[in-house]
């Protein structure tokens, strides 16, 4: 699904890339736009076919994820709602994978999906408007740290040293990543790269 989405994104951005990023594969004529589009369809078809072989309910979640990916890829330029679509793509991975393992949609799956949605939304908003964090530090900070907050709230009856250490480490990593928006000249790429790396902790 991820690879198909990347191909579809490049297919959709062909005209933009010809004007602004001529070094990209399609404008540079390393591959044709038609071939890229066919590759996207092939990857999506493969994902749906494999999911159908495993679980019908999983395929329903996959179709919802596919719809969201396509909506994002086709409308992400100059669309104020595209960060929400990106966040939804990330969140829908959890119920899809859970259903592949015949797991019910339990509280911990919903919490994981909500945490991923929140973190991805904050990251996408910062990537689009780096100054947004300075304008709205509390709401944006809450979005970024929500995965740790949800985890601590969900496990409050069985807190362990590992849980506290992991949550603290995640919070410190977020604070370190956000330095690019505050210290010295604006360095949004530093913040974005480090927040992307933080997805391993979110998961």
Regions found by a protein language model. Name each.
Residues 91-203:
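C-terminal membrane-associated helical module and adjoining short loops/tails
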Residues 26-36, 53-58, 76-83, 131-137, ...:
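Short, amphipathic, aromatic/basic-enriched membrane-interface segments that mark the entry/exit
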Residues 48-52, 74, 175:
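Membrane-embedded alpha-helical segments of multi-pass transporters/permeases
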Residues 1-9, 65-73, 116, 120, ...:
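Alpha-helical transmembrane segments of multi-pass membrane proteins
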């Amino acid at each position: 699904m991820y690879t198909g989405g990347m191909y579809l994104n490049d297919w959709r951005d062909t005209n933009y890339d010809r004007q602004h990023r001529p070094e990209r594969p399609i404008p540079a004529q390393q591959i044709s736009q038609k071939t890229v589009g066919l590759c996207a369809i092939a990857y999506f078809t493969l994902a749906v076919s494999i999911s159908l072989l495993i679980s019908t309910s999983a395929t329903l979640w996959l179709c919802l994820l596919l719809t969201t990916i396509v909506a994002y890829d086709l409308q992400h330029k100059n669309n104020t709602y595209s960060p929400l679509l990106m966040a939804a793509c990330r969140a829908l991975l959890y119920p899809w994978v859970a259903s592949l393992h015949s797991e019910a949609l339990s509280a911990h799956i919903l919490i994981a999906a909500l945490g991923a949605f929140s973190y991805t939304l904050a990251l996408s908003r910062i990537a689009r408007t780096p100054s947004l964090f300075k304008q709205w530090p509390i709401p944006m900070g809450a979005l970024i740290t929500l995965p740790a907050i949800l985890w601590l709230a969900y496990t409050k009856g069985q807190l362990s040293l590992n849980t506290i250490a992991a949550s603290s480490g995640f919070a410190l990593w977020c604070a370190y990543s956000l330095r690019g928006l505050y210290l010295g000249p604006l360095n949004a790429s530093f913040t974005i790269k480090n927040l992307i790396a933080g997805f391993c902790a979110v998961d």
